[in-house]
Amino acid sequence: QQESVLRAMFDAQAGAGFSAMKTPIAGTDFMSAGPFYTYDPVPGDVQMKHFSMARDLGPNGVITYIKRARRYGHFVLQAPMDYPPDWMLFNPDTNQDVNPKYYDALARYYLRYLEDYQKNGVFIDYLSLFNEPDVYTKIPYKEITVLLRDHVAPLLEKSGLKTKLMLSEAPDRDDASTNYPVLMDDAGARNYVAVMPYHGYDFKEYSKIGELHRRYPDVPLWMTEVCYAYEAGTPKSFALPRYEFADGDFWGQQIFNDLENYASAWIYWNAVLDEKGGPWSVSYIHGNPDPNIQHPVIIINRETHEVTYTGLYYYLAHFSKFVRPGAVRIETTGNYPGVRVMSFKSPEGKTVSELMNSRKQDVEVAVVENGRTLRLKLPAVSITTAEW
């Protein structure tokens, strides 16, 4: 059933048409193809002579998966890194900071990743230097500024690759609001930043993103990671993964809140996991950060091979299928308790409205634009797309 799952995710006609995806640089806490890894574990290899993409090229590797997925539809890729090779750190046991003497080597590491992916037919649209720098590689933003401005960006520019740079990904909205100005107020660094990405693990501080937009209105904001996870602290009251369709309403609220505060992309962490909310990886140095049981967009049972498309899948699909790249959010006014509406103008000039009914009963509403009225009955706890 793998092909049917890929079609359901990436085909914009027969499926959701997901148009923005996150792919990790080497090892991450959720991997199915063996133990934790980096592309160059050889200590002191500053010229990347031992750099190897072999894991990603295997039959279950990331490159192989991306190529299969792209048979069904195009999507942009953004790539963050949890950890650089351990030998670049001051203290691998605590993931403590990158030694500045290895900044050039780390820049080469990023470039080799981008070049090798492109040689193998996969272009990375956006590079994030670090995933949650306060959580994984513990590197201050003032040092990220130096690394990006003086090492990574000049090398990338010289290479001729068209990959754009993202600011590293903060674990929540408050962290982004507090720390991003350190880099963004540095004129030399800001010139290289194409997107400000952030994660949604606070589940509440949406206004902080609106503040960032008003401060830097020319730089797009992307919500690039969020999930249900026990280790993240929310929630703890029910078993994961979730099979209830009504669960999608929770995620619909998250999407609405982020987009209303000027996010222009929304990416969920972990598209497909098994019935146990895994697999997760164990690193011999970084230890066992799990069991980090999480809720995916799609659940595949390893024993029965049953595929479950969660409520989250369908709510996400309403946006990704109908609000295509290039659409612009337009002002929507009106109020009905328990009902939210958000509208967009497509590149073709069509109006697309997403209407979410969180009430436990059906609701009748009217959508009015330029004297035209569209009357709709919204089922209880549902999302509806109107296009005209």
What are these model-derived regions, one by one?
Residues 1-124, 146, 150:
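N-terminal catalytic cores of secreted or lumenal carbohydrate-active enzymes
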Residues 19-25, 29, 76-80, 125-129, ...:
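Structural recognition of the beta-strand scaffold that forms the well-ordered cores
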Residues 42-59, 92-107, 131-145, 167-171, ...:
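The substrate-binding groove and active-site-proximal loops of carbohydrate-active enzymes
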Residues 54-58, 62-64, 143, 154, ...:
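Glycoside hydrolase catalytic-domain groove-lining segments
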Residues 87-186, 205-214:
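Active-site cleft segment of glycoside hydrolase catalytic domains centered on the general acid/base Glu
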Residues 171-194, 230-240, 276-278:
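Substrate-binding cleft/loops of secretory-pathway carbohydrate-active enzymes
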Residues 220-315, 331-332:
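Aromatic/acidic polysaccharide-binding cleft in carbohydrate-active enzymes
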Residues 318-322, 331-370, 377, 381:
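Carbohydrate-binding surface patches
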